[in-house]
């Protein structure tokens, strides 16, 4: 199942290799990077570090976090089947998702949706809340991941990331055209 929404590459646009920073794009727009990406000595476990968004991802009014996380997991599962476990921890603020408690709840829901386990919610001194857990590669989790990923992709296919203002502008122009007709 290839993504029609997010592309993942390594540094310099090279094909992604485990252990490298994971660069995420949509079309020609750079969304951000997951760095570090730690690979254990056996090559069977990966830890996804922090996601650092560009202004495109940060300014997107819709929550792109679940989509990007699901794409990262699916990419690893598809291209690196030797990886049996993906771990992660995230506390980065998510604009437009409410306070840290609401953000943590959204992360927990996204993780539960794909069968993640050992989910832990830990307040940190800065007022943020870290959500961590693991996703094991197995038939059920893979199926849940693909269903959740396709749902997220459908959300962003109609109005691509970073293009929301164009959609809003189009609706505003349509409203101006139709409103005089409705008044007449």
Each model region followed by its residue ranges:
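Non-catalytic substrate-recognition and accessory regions of acyl/acetyltransferase enzymes
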Residues: 1-60, 67, 71-184
């Amino acid at each position: 199942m290839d993504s029609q929404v997010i592309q993942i590459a390594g540094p310099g646009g090279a094909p992604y290799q485990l252990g490298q920073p994971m660069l995420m794009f949509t079309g020609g727009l750079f969304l951000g990077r997951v760095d570090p990406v730690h690979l254990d000595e056996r090559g069977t476990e990966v830890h996804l570090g922090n996601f650092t968004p560009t202004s495109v991802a940060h300014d997107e009014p819709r929550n792109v976090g679940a989509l990007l996380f699901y794409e990262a997991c699916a990419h690893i599962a598809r291209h690196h089947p030797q990886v049996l476990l993906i771990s992660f921890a995230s506390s980065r603020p998510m604009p437009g998702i409410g306070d840290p408690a609401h953000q943590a709840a959204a992360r927990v829901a996204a993780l539960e949706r794909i069968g993640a386990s050992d989910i832990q919610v830990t307040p940190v001194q800065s007022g943020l809340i870290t959500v961590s857990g693991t996703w094991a590669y197995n038939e059920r989790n893979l199926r849940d991941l693909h269903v959740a990923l396709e749902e997220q992709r459908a959300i962003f296919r109609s109005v691509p990331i970073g293009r929301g203002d164009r959609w809003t502008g189009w609706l505003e122009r349509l409203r101006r055209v139709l409103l005089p007709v409705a008044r007449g």
